[in-house]
Amino acid sequence: MKRHEAREKALQALFQIDVGHIPPDEAIGNVTGSGEVDPFLRQLVFDVIEHRAEIDELLRSNLEKWKLERVANVDRVILRMATYEMKYVDDVPVSVSLDEAVELAKKFGDWKSGSFVNGVLSKVKAALQK
C-alpha cells in the first residue's frame, strides 16, 4: 500500500474512532477489510491517538477565531494526522505532510477545507520550526 492510500485509510479509521467512538483495531478492520494491515496505516492511527493531547494543544494554539471542537470532524482528523506527521515522523518531509493533508481535505472535506487545512498547518509548521 502506498503512503497516500495509507493516509486515506487512516483518515477514515480515525474519523470512525473520533465520531463513532469505536476501538482502533475495529476501525482499521472496517477500512481495510480482511488481510494484512499496512504498518504506516497502523502507525498513523495508533500514534495520532497516543499523541492526541499534544497534537490538539499545538492545533489550538494555531487556530485563529476557531475552537478545535468546532472544526469540521473530517478537517480536525486531517489536521491531527498531518500535525502528528510534521512533529513526530522524521522520514516524511514536512512539506509532503502538508501537501498530502491539503489533498485529503480537498477530497474528503467541503469546498473550503483545502485552504483551511493549508492555513492552519502552515502556522503549525512555522511553530514547529521555532
UniProtKB/Swiss-Prot annotation:
InterPro entries: NusB-like_sf, NusB_fam, NusB_RsmB_TIM44. The keyword Oxidoreductase does not apply. GO terms for molecular function: RNA binding. Signal peptide: none annotated. The keyword RNA-binding applies. CDD domains: Terminator_NusB (cd00619). It comes from the Bacteria. One of its GO terms (cellular component) is cytosol. Keywords: RNA-binding, Transcription, Transcription antitermination, Transcription regulation. Disulfide bonds: none annotated. GO terms for biological process: DNA-templated transcription termination; transcription antitermination. It holds the Pfam family NusB. Involved in transcription antitermination. Required for transcription of ribosomal RNA (rRNA) genes. Binds specifically to the boxA antiterminator sequence of the ribosomal RNA (rrn) operons. Belongs to the NusB family. PANTHER family: ANTITERMINATION NUSB DOMAIN-CONTAINING PROTEIN, N UTILIZATION SUBSTANCE PROTEIN B-RELATED. This is Transcription antitermination protein NusB.
